Amino acid sequence: MIDTKVNIAGVEFKNPVIAASGTFGFGREFLEYFPISKLGGLATKGLTLREREGNKGVRIHETIGGIMNSIGLQNPGIDAFIEEELPFLNSQDTVIIANVSGNTIDEYVISVEKLNQTDIDMIELNISCPNVKEGGISFGTKAEIASNVVTQVRKVCQKPLIVKLSPSAENIVEMAESCVEAGADALSLVNTFPALAIDISKKKAIFDNITAGLSGPCIKPIALRMVYEVSKAVDVPIIGIGGIMDYRDAIEYIMAGAWAVQVGTANFINPNACAEIIEGIEEYLQKEGISTLEEIRGII
């Protein structure tokens, strides 16, 4: 009898597969493909204190081995999310994780205070956002800046707190250790990689913001290495992200030390990706005679 359950910061997931933020909307869009209750968890579209219309111009661009995106955190804002989207999510039998972004520490804090009053299961702090009070540098680049935002959020956060790390961190292990010391209950890594694409006919960058976030299979070996390194350095659960397209990728992340995985780009290519990965993990465990994920977690 196999058991795919995992417990992260006191929250039980029926399996280790989580739909990644920004790739699954608020879940409704995928109901025609499979029951959302099949998921271990669902991370919401990135939420900000106020509504955001997102970026102008090109938002998605395919590249070899991946996808580049510049959505600009388009979302209805925390209040509208709580009123219009959360009731549906709460009706689904899966772990709901609110992904929160901000341009100032106060924005993060106020958003989390609002979510404290809801039935959200966990909060995932996206620290890849530009810090307007530090000249636009990402909260997730320097450990000291990240530690500050996590510390302030931890003071008010009444939910289990996941911090989502950026691959742009000066030192990913130091960043992870700083966030855990500041109060993170778990870490998810990594976010998209800053990347550039140029239209040589127009002689200009494809995206209006010049750079965009790169995701997909091309980033997996680097993201996998980061998960491995961080898992050896901290004692909180790790959620692996980056280029997970099938169950084999998910198993690799677990063997590298991840407790769970988030599936992102694969959802754009195959709306059934999460469901198929869940089934693939179960079949793999059965075939290999493995009873629990703990038996293979971090074996590398």
UniProtKB/Swiss-Prot annotation:
Binding site for substrate: K45, N69, S70, I71, G72, L73, N126, N191, T192
CC annotations in GO: cytoplasm
PROSITE patterns: DHODEHASE_2 (PS00912)
Active site, UniProt feature: C129 (nucleophile)
Pfam family, one: DHO_dh
Class in the EC hierarchy, top level: oxidoreductase
Subcellular location: Cytoplasm
Pathway where it operates: Pyrimidine metabolism; UMP biosynthesis via de novo pathway; orotate from (S)-dihydroorotate (NAD(+) route): step 1/1
Principal cellular location given in the protein's record: cytoplasm
Cofactor note: Binds 1 FMN per subunit.
Cofactor(s) needed: FMN
Family matches, as PANTHER family: DIHYDROOROTATE DEHYDROGENASE (FUMARATE), DIHYDROOROTATE DEHYDROGENASE (QUINONE), MITOCHONDRIAL-RELATED
Recorded family membership: Belongs to the dihydroorotate dehydrogenase family. Type 1 subfamily.
Designated name of the protein: Dihydroorotate dehydrogenase B (NAD(+)), catalytic subunit
